[in-house]
């Protein structure tokens, strides 16, 4: 028999290479807070259902709280432990603290429903933080929209000057995009916020568990009724990663514009020294590292989304060890989007916009062509004829090196 918690039917010790290959403690230790929260409510339920005594419940509950404090204080090195994962790590610490009583913690529970619970609690906590950071960004963009309502700039299609727009309208466009992202995140929360605990490995438990009480105690809207579904799907992880990818796409596009605008060729925006870096060789350089890194990290988030989708696509019901591979991508996605949202708002607030130059550019380059076309339409000219006529005038103005207004007034 091995010394593993599940080792009763095994005659050989686990190969050291397999033990290392199988372990996830080095990265899933970030779930310790959620794991302890879930375990504390679980033992309260066991006492409520008379499976544990109140004294046993209190002993386990208090020891778990001590373990939480010790982990937060950095008393343990997760890279030097033999336990497979954070769940077994905490259970072993519990047994070391309170002896055989600690062995009762896992009564009526599998790691399958335990990890599913931890992930839902973790993504819920982080989702709330992402939502808060999105709200700050939306407020920042709203402020910029109001501040620059009257500041004209060239609008672009195909990165070519198209029509004049307000700089405020530009920021409002991104405000709308991030507002939809916020709505998507809140929709995800409604689907995710259900408890899997009590589903066991896949078929529940013969013990008289009160799943609804546990769900309510942990702040869930209810339980996942089908136990197979509760432990076997990671659609809530995939959906959060998908929302994160959408947010990163919008951040990347915003950053791309600001990178272009900060070049000498555009000169629409000046980077604050506190949010720019220099060159190790060229003393003249002022580099937009913040938006470049955000733009680059978007690809990283996309990659994690595709990886998790690919992991899940061929798995039979219910739980499979492949699903351990959801965590590193999820954790990195969450950490990446949080740091990007934390950086983008103060970065935007630090920028200085060259609004006089933007206005000058908006009033040159034949950006008034569409307005002139539509004025001809209002006078009764067919649209296609008006389009052809204004195009001919533009060609003539380019040849004469004058504006459309100058050409038309001269005519």
From Swiss-Prot:
Catalytic activity: 2-(N(omega)-L-arginino)succinate = fumarate + L-arginine
Subcellular location: Cytoplasm
InterPro entries reported in the protein's UniProt record: Arg_succ_lyase_C (IPR029419), Argininosuccinate_lyase (IPR009049), Fumarase/histidase_N (IPR024083), Fumarate_lyase_CS (IPR020557), Fumarate_lyase_fam (IPR000362), Fumarate_lyase_N (IPR022761), L-Aspartase-like (IPR008948)
Coiled coil spans: none
Gene Ontology molecular function: argininosuccinate lyase activity
Transmembrane segments: none
One Gene Ontology cellular component: cytosol
Record keyword Cytoplasm present: yes
Pfam family membership, one: Lyase_1
Main localization (coarse): cytoplasm
EC number(s) from the headed UniProt entry: 4.3.2.1
Pathway this chain belongs to: Amino-acid biosynthesis; L-arginine biosynthesis; L-arginine from L-ornithine and carbamoyl phosphate: step 3/3
Assigned keywords, A-Z: Amino-acid biosynthesis, Arginine biosynthesis, Cytoplasm, Lyase
GO biological process annotation, one example: arginine biosynthetic process via ornithine
Gene3D superfamilies with a match to the protein in the record: Fumarase/aspartase (C-terminal domain), Fumarase/aspartase (Central domain), Fumarase/aspartase (N-terminal domain)
PANTHER family tied to this protein: ARGININOSUCCINATE LYASE
Family of the protein in this entry: Belongs to the lyase 1 family. Argininosuccinate lyase subfamily.
Name of this protein: Argininosuccinate lyase
Organism of provenance: Legionella pneumophila (strain Lens)
């Amino acid at each position: 028999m091995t010394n593993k918690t599940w080792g009763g039917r095994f005659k050989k010790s686990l190969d050291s290479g397999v033990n290392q290959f199988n372990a996830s403690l080095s990265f899933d230790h970030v779930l310790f807070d959620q794991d302890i929260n879930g375990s504390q409510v679980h033992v309260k339920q066991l006492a409520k259902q008379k499976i544990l005594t109140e004294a046993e419940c209190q002993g386990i509950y208090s020891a778990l709280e001590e373990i939480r404090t010790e982990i937060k204080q950095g008393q343990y090195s997760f890279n030097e432990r033999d336990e497979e994962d954070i769940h077994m790590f905490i259970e072993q610490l519990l047994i070391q603290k309170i002896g055989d009583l600690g062995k009762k913690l896992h009564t009526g529970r599998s790691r399958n429903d335990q990890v599913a619970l931890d992930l839902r609690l973790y993504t819920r906590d982080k989702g709330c933080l992402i939502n808060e950071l999105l709200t700050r960004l939306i407020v920042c963009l709203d402020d910029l929209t109001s501040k620059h309502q009257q500041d004209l700039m060239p609008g672009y299609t195909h990165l070519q000057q198209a029509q004049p727009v307000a700089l405020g309208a530009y920021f409002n466009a991104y405000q709308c995009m991030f507002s939809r992202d916020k709505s998507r995140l809140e929709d995800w929360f409604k689907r995710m916020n259900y408890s899997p605990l009590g589903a066991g490995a896949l078929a529940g438990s013969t013990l008289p568990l009160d799943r609804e009480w546990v769900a309510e105690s942990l702040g869930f809207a209810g339980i996942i009724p089908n136990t197979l579904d509760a432990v076997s799907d990671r659609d809530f992880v995939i959906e959060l990663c998908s929302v994160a990818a959408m947010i990163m796409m919008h951040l990347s596009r915003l950053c791309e514009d600001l990178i272009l605008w900060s070049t000498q060729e555009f000169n629409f925006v000046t980077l604050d020294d506190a949010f720019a870096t220099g060159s190790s060789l060229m003393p003249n350089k002022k580099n937009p590292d913040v938006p470049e890194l955000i733009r680059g990290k978007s690809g990283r988030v996309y990659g994690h989304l595709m990886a998790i989708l690919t992991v899940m696509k061929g798995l039979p019901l219910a739980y499979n060890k492949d699903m351990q591979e959801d965590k590193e991508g999820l954790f990195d996605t969450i950490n990446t989007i949080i740091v990007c949202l934390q950086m983008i708002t103060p970065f935007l607030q630090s920028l200085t916009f060259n609004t006089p130059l933007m206005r000058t550019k908006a009033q040159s380059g034949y950006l008034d062509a569409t307005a002139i076309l539509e004025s001809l339409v209002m006078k009764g000219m067919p649209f296609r004829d008006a389009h052809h006529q204004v195009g001919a005038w533009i060609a003539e103005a380019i040849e004469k090196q004058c504006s459309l207004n100058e050409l038309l007034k001269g005519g």
